[in-house]
Amino acid sequence: MNLLSLRPFGARLLGTVIAVIALAGAVTVAASAHGGGGDKEAVAIDGGATLLTVDAGTLEALSGAGFAVEPIEPAQVSQAASGEVTFAFPIAWGSLAASDLSGKIKHRGGLNLSMDGTTVGVKNFVIDTSAGVLTAKVVGSRDRIPLLNLDLTNLQAFVFDDSAVLRGVGATLTAEAATALNAAFETDLFTEGLTVGTADVFATLAD
């Protein structure tokens, strides 16, 4: 079973990300996660994407156990020549405090994790930078669970007039998610603190 169902990022989504990355690259000073920010109390987000680059070791472990990972549209996935796999989740909307970047960012799309006829889907991710967690809606239920713990220790943040960039967000599996996945797939592969990867947020700001 193939681990990933790969498809290139769509042109519109890729164009948005490239534009925001280019703007971030032109800036030489980054605000830390808990400092600097700007002269606005809050910034409203109305688009962009969050990219999740998956840890290579975790991918290998999942592949060896027979798992398949597929994006739920409009999320997309791409693989670099190096083998690095990145999922892109479009941003629906959100808001961040300019002073410390606390707030929430809501996304569209999600992920399906499958093995031996069993599929668990999670979608509509919400990043809560204040709580340091990413929550997800479980497909087929009304439940929303804490899916990933977010480590902002190495965060680099940039806020501009029309965009915001949060780079280097570490993502690990929560205890609740690990328990649910182990129960669904009758395995002990998933553990609290399992390294999932690194997230980079490229957000466009509302006018």
Where is each model-derived feature located?
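Poly-acidic low-complexity segments
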Residues: 2, 54-55, 128, 154
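Intrinsic-disorder/low-complexity peptide segments enriched for small residues
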Residues: 1-4, 11, 21, 145, ...
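Extended hydrophobic/Leu-rich segments
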Residues: 3, 120, 155-160, 205
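N-terminal segment immediately downstream of the Sec signal-peptide cleavage site
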Residues: 32-100, 155, 164-207
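Predominantly extracellular/secreted and cell-surface proteins with exposed
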Residues: 72-146
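Acidic, glycine-rich flexible loop segments
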Residues: 124, 130-175
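Secretory targeting and sorting signals
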Residues: 1-33
